[in-house]
């Protein structure tokens, strides 16, 4: 009898508060019917206790769209026997973690789109150099509160049912859940409000997309898009169920506008990479084609790689044989982004932007990244560098050249952030390349190898001719005269 007291008390409270314990009639609310399981009566018991223990959390749920529509705690947290993280709590079998599998009971389309995305795969970094830096050069505690909070941890359940505190709490976008699913919806739709408005605001992305190696948030803020957003952020109708650019709002785009949200001719998507034609992450950028398999797994193939045909059985990168459902070329991916751009910009302006963007990426690739990468590879082959990562100064210099400075330049160009494209970008790339990378190559390689490498990969390019040839007397005089006229005589 004692167990049902909270149920009776909370039922009365909810009736007074006017919130439904079970889903209301769909036709009366002008919406599609909720699944039959929604509005489980067990949820009232949860609310009764947690209203006293975690009132703010319950208040957030009450204010959420799910709370208003009658979807309650037990609907999302219910577990089944055999679930790795299931445990009995006050007579109910529940799980703390709500995984994409759980969300998919109502939001299957969104989960299907997310399933093969780069977001879902963000936790698969165990073999990467970034992870080596975190785990070995830094240490596991730094990884737990740093890398994994964005990329996602592999949640481990200890004997007795508790989570390993080295892996939990965690809401990283690529979290590996106990039920085997990848991802965390709450990374963007923070519990327990689950707000579409919050997920559409740039700040939701800014938790992870910022800093010296991926400064999308900083680039966005200095761009015209970010300036417009700050000026008119309260006029974007972000809480609407549908959010179509040019229809529901016109004032300013957010990250979601370009990468996820609907246009009059294109549906919304939870695959944030679907409209991206370049990869700006590796040392050398390449355009990417996308292969979609019948199990909704996706993978990128660099431009120039032979593409499979629809219906063909191929071995994917993870070793599994899958049937090809669709192939998107990098041009088709770009067309999807161009469709978004055209909602606000004329065709000539969009074409000009992409021309400038492409040229910057090619400048970075050809003038700095390819020569530096080729030199590093030759030094490894000549055994001038050990195969152990990051044990020599030159490896750190090269790493930051592409991973920090090179990314900043490319991201700056991709989102119209001039300061990041130049001063935080190509300027820093050039400074590191000429004043650190080349001198360190000379020291590591020794002669005659250093001269051979630099002549082959660097000085043979017209863009590097100034390093050896310097400037003419006339060019120097022209610069000096400019500064004299602008700033006066300088002592």
Walk through the language-model features, giving the residues of each.
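C-terminal segment of classical bacterial N-terminal signal peptides
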Residues: 14-25
